[in-house]
């Protein structure tokens, strides 16, 4: 008994609400374990002892995470200790609290509903602290909190979260406006939430929301424009609020007042709203449930799941507004794969039909129907996705037989919305609806519209309305089945999805009273609308097992059938295509391939098809063969896990290349002879219909060669780049462009496979891949530390060569625009290739300290291992020197001075001397042996600038030996004598380091060459041998702010130089 009691007590959590039947999951265990571990570590310690102990402990990755989670647990469960704990965690965190933010984001997304009341309030406090101190990535936590602020929910718990977030946004408005995506999400969410807060008891909250949202929309309208058409749909639901009514007037009347780039309402309506904004209006838990329903529940078994969903989320009157959010999410976000479309999983149209037919609120029902047909109104076949209009036609088509009330309601709504949604631009709306219906027929989503539009189950008034609106679709259509054979391009089913980009169209300003832009929630005509609310018995029978079975039966079109559309689309198309007679040589093998759809029958057909000349086919026959083969090859490819789970096990490797498309690659690998024109045409159409063919071929050759080599170790199997070239020729693209595009697609699809293939790519496509900046960028953007390590291993073992010396500098020059992490990885790879400095040193003058810190850091490390040479010094001193100097050049000179002081001094002196004419007309100065004078040497001012900034870096005499050598002394004296007054004044402290020479030097004699005050030419001639006191020169030209340290350094240098000269004279 005591044991049971202790077990129950152990399960009590301060962070999560736990019922008697709940068990701790891994997340809860992790948080509580980290809290207990932290308490054991810091118990009884003073603040200083705790900080010292934790500072050492966080150096280990695992302990750092445990400590971070432990602190997070305390801040969420103990309000009295929260402030002190926040201070402690800022002191010991070594990742800018990134670990805490990451765990908090996960906690909000996955466990918010289970948090205790105290934890929810502390969460808001912690968010406020994070925003106040601008902690990185806090916007991710905010976005997930916005998702938890559910629509259709006016419970006190939900209202607390909404108002708390609103207060944070108002208080930290400046921070909010720095993140455009968060601005967009906030506006989209609050416009949606305002709709639910019409209760007079919520008037104060609603006014606060309206004031904040309107202000944010007007001041940040350029960020609001990308919200697109669904933002307009939400604005319609709040159009009766005075502030939003005025906003509507500005949008329609005076769009330029909102933003200079805004051209009116049509610009918004032709921008597809991003999936993320549609997603943010569903609770994460609700999203998981509806996604499970659409991906894992079999058609016919869905009723119990729908009943649970109804009781959970549609229990209150306010919750009916959620139906529109769900329908928009299902239509735009849940796009089933080919495998799912061909399976018995409940289709999207059935879920949407249930959401609409079970709605008992007239306004919510009208809004739900608008959500279903919203994309129809602005549909552009060239840019929009057919998956967004498919559910609308299918729910009507499948319901007309057993549930005509659903089809009648939706058809009536479609007819009326086409005419009344935007009266002034009815023609544009009608074009969008016509485009939708036309593409639906062309893509064979349904065979034809007659069973729907001319059904005897529709009342006469509705049939007349349909006839008035869709007259073009009522006459018997042309043989749409033949469309498949009239073009060389195969018809891609609507299952081949592609995302549409944002579109912007322009329109004139519209008069508010003439536009006819209807407000669904405010202008419903109760007398005219057709709203058939089914009985409970009808609701239970909607899309039941019996209906599902009936929908699968095959009937003739004259029998008013709608059942074919529940079959996989590919089977429907094949069944409805007219039989085409083919040449005897391929008829049998083609039929076998169409029936069995496997690699064996496919390769047998290719063997028969390849040698056939163009004369063996009529055009419609070739089109028939091509369209069917492309469709089957596409549909037989798996949508997920297309690559092998293992890179070593033969079973997994062989299975991953067992699909028919790989049969084509195998056939090409084993047959090198030239193909006839029909086969080339087939190959070209396959390339167009399956964009992934390029990287799948590369993957196939890697696996195939690996497996064949294992089977027959006596024979070597290698990549055949000729096959890839054949694919590129079929696609009519250059091999370099094809390779980059395919590798880019592969990296986005599966980074591990991309990196696995990388050594083979660089080996087999050496001329294209080596020093290729685009390929390098694709590689660098996806690698982490472990990947960099593996790449370095491959380079060290000679398996991978990414760079060659010739042309590498151009590659590095282009990489200067890469992200910081990418550049650091790049320099590690360059270093692994043992590239000599001479191959890349010419870029040194181009590097800027502010723009290229990564490259300069690496060059500095390279220079530490090199001796100074004339060429390197010339390039370094050619760098532009800013007012504060060039720390890169100064650093290099400092560490070279420690080992190569005399050599460095001579090289720089030679460069400086070469900028001035010879002092004696009868003598010609020559640089020391081994030092050549380049035509692209730095200017005298550049050299003097760098020497001056180097001098300033010297303190207490350290590093000043550079100036005491004879050549440097003579160079500085020569520079001084040939400089104008402004230059002498600018570098007076530098020139002061040059010691004056005695009148005679050694045995040769001659006039002494000393530094002189600036004077006229006459003065120079008359006093050529006079000596000037260095201190006097210094007094005339030095600046007033020289420090005592600099004076001490210069004095020491002068003394050293004089001693060296005296020693030289004595030796002479």
Swiss-Prot record:
GO terms for cellular component: cytoplasm; Golgi apparatus; INTAC complex; integrator complex; nucleus. The keyword NADP does not apply. Keywords: Cytoplasm, Nucleus, Phosphoprotein. The keyword Repeat does not apply. Its main location: nucleus. It comes from the Eukaryota. The modification Phosphoserine is found at residues 1038-1039, 1043-1044. Residues 916-939, 1000-1068 are annotated as: Disordered. It is found in: Nucleus; Cytoplasm. InterPro entries: HEAT_Ints3_C, INTS3, INTS3_N. Pfam families: HEAT_Ints3_C, Ints3_N. GO terms for biological process: RNA polymerase II transcription initiation surveillance; snRNA processing. Belongs to the Integrator subunit 3 family. Belongs to the multiprotein complex Integrator, at least composed of IntS1, IntS2, IntS3, IntS4, omd/IntS5, IntS6, defl/IntS7, IntS8, IntS9, IntS10, IntS11, IntS12, asun/IntS13, IntS14 and IntS15. The core complex associates with protein phosphatase 2A subunits mts/PP2A and Pp2A-29B, to form the Integrator-PP2A (INTAC) complex. Component of the integrator complex, a multiprotein complex that terminates RNA polymerase II (Pol II) transcription in the promoter-proximal region of genes. The integrator complex provides a quality checkpoint during transcription elongation by driving premature transcription termination of transcripts that are unfavorably configured for transcriptional elongation: the complex terminates transcription by (1) catalyzing dephosphorylation of the C-terminal domain (CTD) of Pol II subunit Polr2A/Rbp1 and Spt5, and (2) degrading the exiting nascent RNA transcript via endonuclease activity. This is Integrator complex subunit 3. The gene is IntS3.
